[in-house]
Amino acid sequence: MAGGVKGIGKFFGDVVAEMKRVSWPTRKELTRYTLVVLGTVAFITVFFAVVDYGISALVRGLIE
């Protein structure tokens, strides 16, 4: 085992040190980003539902 227990301890120590250097978003930014993601997901969901319905109607029309 290269490093062993000391290696694992150093790894987690480095992780903690790196997490302290991270620039975390404010609550306001986080809320805004979350709403943007949810809005984008909703838009894409509706878009693909409409496209799916259109293709289904087209195929049904060709079959009948």
UniProtKB/Swiss-Prot annotation:
Principal cellular location given in the protein's record: membrane
Keyword terms of this UniProt record: Cell membrane, Membrane, Protein transport, Translocation, Transmembrane, Transmembrane helix, Transport
PROSITE patterns (alphabetical): SECE_SEC61G
Any one GO cellular component localisation term in the record: plasma membrane
Transmembrane segments: 35-55
GO molecular function, a single term: protein transmembrane transporter activity
Pfam families found in the cross-reference section: SecE (PF00584)
GO biological process, one term: protein secretion
Cell location: Cell membrane
Membrane topology field: Single-pass membrane protein
Assembly and binders: Component of the Sec protein translocase complex. Heterotrimer consisting of SecY, SecE and SecG subunits. The heterotrimers can form oligomers, although 1 heterotrimer is thought to be able to translocate proteins. Interacts with the ribosome. Interacts with SecDF, and other proteins may be involved. Interacts with SecA.
Its job: Essential subunit of the Sec protein translocation channel SecYEG. Clamps together the 2 halves of SecY. May contact the channel plug during translocation.
Family from the record: Belongs to the SecE/SEC61-gamma family.
Name of the protein in its database record: Protein translocase subunit SecE
Gene that this polypeptide is encoded by: secE
